[in-house]
Structures are given as C-alpha cells and as structure tokens.
Amino acid sequence: MTNFTDIRDFLRAHCARYPELALQDVFKALYQSAFGCEHLIAGPSAAADYIRAEAARSGDRISKLVELLGGDYCRVHLGILQDGLSAETFARLFALSARHEECGREKLEAMLTALQTMADAGELPFSAQETAEAVERWRKDGFPPLHHSEIFRQNYAPAYRVLRRDFARALPLFARIDRLTAERSRVLVAIEGGSASGKTTLGELLQNVYGCPVFHMDDFFLRPEQRTEARFTQPGGNVDRERFLEEVLIHLREGRPVDYRRFDCATFTIAPPQRIEAGTLNIVEGAYSMHPDLAPYYDLSVFLPISAEKQRERILKRNAPAHAKQFFDRWIPFEQRYFDALDVRNRCDLILSADD
C-alpha cells in the first residue's frame, strides 16, 4: 500500500474506528501494514497457550473483527476462536504469516509521508508539528515495533494477531475443519473451483498448517482410450473420476493407504504408485472434485469462485501464450459447463472468494 489515496483512506478509517487512539497506535498500524507480525514467535504449543490465555483475559470485550491493514496483512481478533477455530490452528497461521518483508522500510516511509501530508492538511487528530517530531524520533530509533498506548488499551482492549490477508479469507474453512476433526477420526475435504482460482495454493496452506496429505485432480487426466467424443460431451467427463474414486477416495474413506498413481501428461501413461497413508485430515483439490459420483465421500467442500477477468490475468501470467489459449478455448469451457449443468457451486458447503 504505497498509493497516497489508499493510504489516506486507510488512515481515515483507522482514526474513525479508534477515535481515542494515540499517534503511536497509528505508527503501530503502519508498521504492521509494512512488516506484518512484529512479535517473536514462540513454539507452536506455547503460542497456542498464549492465545488461549489472552482470549480468556479479554472476557466479554473480545471481538471477532477481521480488521484490514494496509498491504497484505490484517488484524484478526481473538473472538474468532468462538467460531470453532482452534488456538493451535490460529498459532500456526500466525507463525506462517511472520516473514521478512524486504521492501518493508520503503513501504513504511511512503506511508509516513502520506501521514505527514494529512497532518499538515489538518485531516488527522494530531498536529503537523507533533506528527513530524514523533516520526523523526521513531526514525532515529530505527523504526522499532511499538506497543499500543495505554489509552488505546483502556478504551479498546486489543486482543488480536496479525495474519496475511489471504490466510484470513480462509478462516471460515479452518474453523469448520477444526470442528470436524475434533468430532471425527477421519475428515475428507474437497476444494473445488475453476482454473487459477487458488485451489492448489489453498491446498498447500492446509498442508502446511495441518501436515495433512493433499490429492490433486490434475493427476487424474483421462487416459488415451477414455478420450472419446461421448466422454467429452458429459458434464464433468474431463477427468478420470472412476480411477480417482477406486484408487483414492474409497481408500481414504476407509482409512486405508493410497497407492497414488499420477497421470504423466508428457508420456500419456500412469506413473508407478507412491504409497500415501490416509490422514486424520485429507484434502482433495481440483476442478471436478465435487462431481456427483465423488461428492458423497466428503465431509466438507469449499468452492473458490473467480471472475473471468482475474482468471484470464492469472492464466496469462503463469502460462505461455499457446498453453493459455488451450485454457481459454478448451479447458475453461469444459469446467463452466460442468459447474452450470451440475450446480456445483451451490452444492458446496462453503464459498471463499479468490479475488483480491
């Protein structure tokens, strides 16, 4: 967030939300917008214990607010635990959000310039001189992380962690998974959606948080003998769902190991098996994962919609022109016909937007 208009809008909204804030609270929000998490990360168990204890101390003042900061981050208030998210999952997301921001100082300086411009124009509850002097002191100290002011703590009882925005979008899914895994010995989750909607990225995040196996529908393209005109006329016919059901889903549902055989698109053959143990949590990601033949085997499903404009932008960015053309002319129309004919989006339990 280095665009002046965006910074001004953020600062105005922040001061309006917290009318009793001090200048150091504004600095803290700008620091978090530029650098993200400023806390030292304890081990997973200790971090979860801290979260539980802080939530308990907050009592009835706790909030479920997900508060957007500038840039890639947001504040997620600890009341989110009341929706079923476990402290352990929250702690892992917090740790994964802590990363070194190489351009953090540059971003912070741009935001401070905008802050001073607004103070000079009388748009903030701080004088121009007060702002300039405080910024200079902070700069001379090397921009260390700051605590909230005492007046802020008294008025607003802040209890939150800074997470990446893309992680926070998936919090409803994490909460549902945590509730299910607390109740059941085995949970299967499907991530459905169109090309470039973020299915693989979400699957990787779930794997990083839970250490669970992830299975990809893209490993089950049709074998040469299946690629018939009749097959391609079927909504959802563009995947070897029969092999996926027999070799993967049934095994996972029964808690048996999977001898996972990927389809090799270079040779049009099936690779030798790789043994994968069924987990407590098992993720299936990819278009066609919620085909009616497969859907009954899942405990939870999520659909990732994406606008045509964003989809096109992402596909062009990650593919050579000839390959991108295949998506636009062939694969996306196949997917859209499947989504429409089988009402896939509405049959999923959750919908999480992939658009920014």
Per-segment meaning from a language model:
Residues M1-R153:
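Long, basic/Gly/Ser/Thr-rich N-terminal segments
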Residues N155-A182:
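N-terminal pre-Walker A segment at the start of P-loop NTPase domains
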Residues L188-A190:
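Short hydrophobic/aromatic beta-strand immediately N-terminal to the Walker A/P-loop
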Residues G194:
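P-loop (Walker A) phosphate-binding loop of NTP-binding proteins
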Residues K199:
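Conserved lysine of the Walker
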Residues L202-G203, Q207:
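Post-Walker A alpha-helix
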Residues Y210-H216, F220-I276, L281-V284:
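Conserved nucleotide-sensing/catalytic segment adjacent to the nucleotide-binding pocket
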Residues I270-R318:
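ATP-dependent NMP and nucleoside kinases share a basic, alpha-helical "lid"
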